């Protein structure tokens, strides 16, 4: 019954708010968007066994490849949770980089499998974003 309610709710969403299907993603890859992996089930990766971690990091990449025809190059850690073991799985799976939720900027010598990010709110105005993008809001590295 809950599954039926979820399907009905999904159909009632405006098309722009529905998850993209494989055909839509395939049509956009390469031109408008890059596709990365965020795991198979969005679990906190450091808490998983090696077998579970394999599915979340490695198998999910292969599944996405089969669905949309590209090998994703970037992995975003669910909840930003990672540790050296998780980082090693992401590296050995063939990703070019791993993205954390650690706030900040990155420099050339930084570890590509634990990159920091800058969170931009969806509510930011165009003018505020443009000011931020040209450096009018200073960022400090701690």
What are the language-model segments listed below?
Residues 30, 40-43, 47-142:
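C-terminal active-site subregion of NodB/CE4 polysaccharide deacetylases
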Residues 1-32:
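Active-site beta->alpha N-cap acidic-glycine motif
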């Amino acid at each position: 019954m809950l599954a039926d309610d979820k399907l009905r709710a999904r159909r009632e969403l405006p098309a722009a708010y529905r998850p993209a299907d494989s055909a839509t993603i395939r049509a956009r890859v390469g031109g408008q968007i890059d596709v990365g992996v965020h795991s198979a089930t969005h679990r906190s990766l450091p808490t998983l066994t090696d077998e579970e971690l394999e599915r979340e990091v490695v198998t999910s990449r292969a599944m996405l490849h089969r669905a949309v025809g590209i090998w994703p190059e970037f992995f975003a850690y669910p909840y930003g949770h990672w540790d050296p073991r998780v980082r090693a799985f992401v590296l050995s799976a063939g990703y070019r980089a791993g993205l954390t939720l650690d706030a900040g900027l990155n420099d050339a010598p930084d570890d590509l499998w634990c990159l920091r990010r800058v969170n931009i709110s969806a509510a930011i105005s165009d003018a505020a974003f443009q000011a931020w993008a040209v450096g009018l809001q200073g960022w400090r590295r701690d």
